Amino acid sequence: MTMAALDVFNVPYSVPLLGSTVVILIGFIAIKALRVGSRPKGLPPGPPTEFIWGNTKQIDLFYPQYQYRKWAQQYGPVYTVMLGDTAHVVVSGLRDVRDIFIKQGASSQNRPPSRFQLLMRDGFFPGLNNGEKWRQSRRMWQAVLNNSAAKQYLPYQELETRQLLFDLLRAPTEWRDHIERYSNSVAMTMVNGRRIIDAADPRVKETIQDLYDLAETGVRGAFLDSWPFLWKLPEWMFPVCRQARKIAAKHREYIWRNYSDVAKRTSQGEVLPSVNHAIQEKLKQGWPGVSEIEGAEIGHHLLTGTTDTTASTLINWVAAMCLHPEAQKKAQEEIDRVVGPNRLPTDADAANLPYVQQVIQEAQRWITAVPLSLPRAANAPVHWGKYTIPEETGLIMNSHALHNDPDIFPEPDKFKPERWEGKPNASSNGDAQLLFTFGAGRRVCPGQHLAERSLFLVISHWLWGFDTLQATDDDKNKIPIDKDDLRPGFIVCLNPFPAKITPRTAQHRELIERIWKEELEVSLDESQQWKATPEGIARLLERVGK
């Protein structure tokens, strides 16, 4: 060391220099600390923040959509909230959603860092990943779920709808379980090549609980992503991380069990074409950058999304029919004119049943199954008015506020299917989009076409065959249904409520029984599994596996 260097430590220079350095360092740390929870400069304004907490304590984190809607009324269609020390821009205006998520979709397609939620999925969950991992998953989903491909699954959906009608005859009070079996069976047959023949099958609840665990525990552990510096501390300090790892192990066992069952049946020559079988074939041929457990997760992603979104929307629709019998009656009158009592509705009837379609659209608006879509993040600067939203800033599509905006939907609390007259394509991803159940832009739900067909088939058949009434107690008083009594999560639906489901006539009952008996004899084997995969599905999945 040179004498000049040593001079730094000599008195009288060393003490003032060291003191100044410490003061500057403490000041820098203090300034940084005082800014924790405060809104960064240059972002759209929003509600006042609190030191450290930001806006976190002002929000019910299990039901944030309600507070976000109130703030939209106060601060405008685009505002910024601070969840801890992370900024999120909440977008609630129709024009603004179209601008930020559709027109600027190339810059608003990422997911924000979700390290805690990814902890519950061993680091890989396609819907929360970015970059090449997400693109690989998306390409697979698009191949099996694009508009043309989704049409091929119609035989699966028709058969499951017919069982649903029969199940409603057999056990009408268990209507919620029948809905969940329907949606899970369509998904299971697609993904694993095996039907769910009974609502008591534990895989139905297991599938729904798997996604609920991710959502519910994700809220409890969200503070770790809200204050990212906490990840620098040992994981053992946070009990919620232990819970997350337990959920990850449970999830891994579940998806691997389904995936391995397909491989086992393939080796025994019993497999039917399925998404997981196509994934396994693709992996055998070499799928760069995708491991086998990741392949299993890509397939499972379709299973959970298809099951829960469809089931939740149908459950919410049942409540709408209980509370709005006039809409139900009008839809049934239309079905009676077009279909009549001597046959079931078909997918081809959709164009001739505009009011039924409007009922379906209104049900999705009235209670939005995915009220905040899934959070996004800017992957490039996003421009809104005079503001530039920088890369990595969180973006929240406030579908709940959009669907309850009185300027777009007058009297939004009322169930009015007529508001959708002349708007059959309101959910189509684009500049004219009005309905955002499935999101918008580059991250729109890939299963939208399949889900919309399921909603039409189930609702048109249900209206054709059954009356749905509000249940009554022993004193004949109607049992209330609160449309805000929701199960929390990414995907919301009403908590359990009773409904009275009865066949419309003996003629409707007889036709339901006869058609299901024919399905058992013609389409299904003695274990009520498909005797053979419909040709269109087999060809599609064979192509995907190459």
Curated annotation (Swiss-Prot):
According to its UniProt record, where is this protein mainly located? membrane
Q: Can the keyword Membrane be found in this entry's annotation?
A: yes
Gene3D superfamilies according to UniProt? Cytochrome P450
Family from the record: Belongs to the cytochrome P450 family.
- Ligand binding (heme): C445
PROSITE patterns cross-referenced by the UniProt entry: CYTOCHROME_P450 (PS00086)
Q: What does this protein do?
A: Cytochrome P450 monooxygenase; part of the gene cluster that mediates the biosynthesis of asperlin, a polyketide showing anti-inflammatory, antitumor and antibiotic activities. The first step of the asperlin biosynthesis is the production of the intermediate 2,4,6-octatrienoic acid by the highly redusing polyketide synthase alnA with cleavage of the PKS product by the esterase alnB. 2,4,6-octatrienoic acid is further converted to asperlin via several steps involving the remaining enzymes from the cluster.
Which gene underlies this protein? alnH
Q: Could you tell me what this protein is called? A: Cytochrome P450 monooxygenase alnH
Query: E.C. number, please?
Result: 1.-.-.-
Q: Which GO terms describe its cellular component?
A: membrane
Pfam families recorded: p450 (PF00067)
How would you classify this enzyme at the top EC level? oxidoreductase
Pathway it acts in? Polyketide biosynthesis
Family matches, as InterPro entries: Cyt_P450 (IPR001128), Cyt_P450_CS (IPR017972), Cyt_P450_E_grp-I (IPR002401), Cyt_P450_sf (IPR036396), Cytochrome_P450_fung (IPR050364)
Stretches that traverse the bilayer: 11-31
In terms of superkingdom, the source organism counts as: Eukaryota
Tell me the cofactors it needs. heme
Q: What triggers production of this protein?
A: Expression is controlled by the asperlin biosynthesis cluster-specific transcription factor alnR.
